[in-house]
Amino acid sequence: MTFSFHHHLRDGDYVVNLVMAAAIEELGLKDLTIAATSLGSAHDPIADYIEQGKVVGIQTSGIRGRMGEVVSAGKLKTPAVIRSHGGRPRAIEAGEVHIDIAFVAAPTSDCVGNCRGVGGKSDCGSLGYAMTDTKYADHVVVVTDCLVDFPNFPAS
């Protein structure tokens, strides 16, 4: 199963950690692939899941921190796939990457999932880079700490 994430919140993004902890520790999922735009030191806890063999694949444009060290040490079950920022959406559109669930961290969202990169406590700008994931994923989950009235407008 492949989960996608975006790094709009940079090193303040703990959505990857929360989702993976719930999927692995609470739901007992395994053989997971992370398709993230980029992974940094905020995502160091994921290194444990790689070492345990729960996360078996990574597709991203960058891996830093402890997770990068674990992957460089050969502990990931399958080779990590590193693509440019433009190569990632192209691979998704071409069907080279299948996303089961796209998780989009957003500063604001309304009750039907219209999300924006502004207006909340953690503005990050345009969420346009997440559009390919949300278009091609089997399921989309918007994660926010600021629920706003419908419609969340204008789009960003």
Predicted regions and their residues:
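Conserved alpha/beta enzyme-core scaffold
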Residues: 1-156
